[in-house]
């Protein structure tokens, strides 16, 4: 019955209800959440938690993109699985433009920035129109694509970037945990 209304906003609301109604003391809830996020962000292999997919296994600690420019305002943009959520009405309402269109708009409207688009490691070996359209964004000035199989350290990228942009993925809340400014575009489970 809980999952009867399966929209993302409902899931976010249910998570908040569970959090608020739990008998666990608030300080313990925060301590548990902080511990989980700290392990997720700081355990580069993420092998200590069987519930976390091993997306960082190949990443080299503190490796940054070769194109990194200290003299620019650097934006780390983390792509979500558009093909999984793209047809959900709630997602369409909260994000009327695709991630590709959004990146195009940002890069054309704001000069003197570098955008580092991290394609999710889960999308490696996916020959999909969406992934290919993301790769094509490298033709734009100031847009740098980090391929799924790249050894660039995603969490270090978060730490050194000036701004994090997320399309509803957990990277948004992870970056907020690192005290980074975060712009989340579209709906998310952590609203």
Segments and roles (model prediction):
Residues 37-134:
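Conserved catalytic-core segment of nucleotide-activated headgroup transferases in glycan assembly
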Residues 131-148:
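Nucleotide-activated donor-binding/catalytic signature segment of Leloir-type glycosyltransferases, i.e.
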Residues 111, 139, 176:
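Anion (oxyanion) recognition and catalysis
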Residues 89, 139, 156:
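Short, basic, glycine/proline-bearing loop/turn elements
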Residues 1, 149-191:
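A donor-sugar binding/catalytic signature common to diverse glycosyltransferases
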Residues 78-80, 118-122, 146-148, 166-168, ...:
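Generic beta-strand/beta-sheet core signal
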Residues 1-55:
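Active-site-proximal region of nucleotide-activated glycan assembly enzymes
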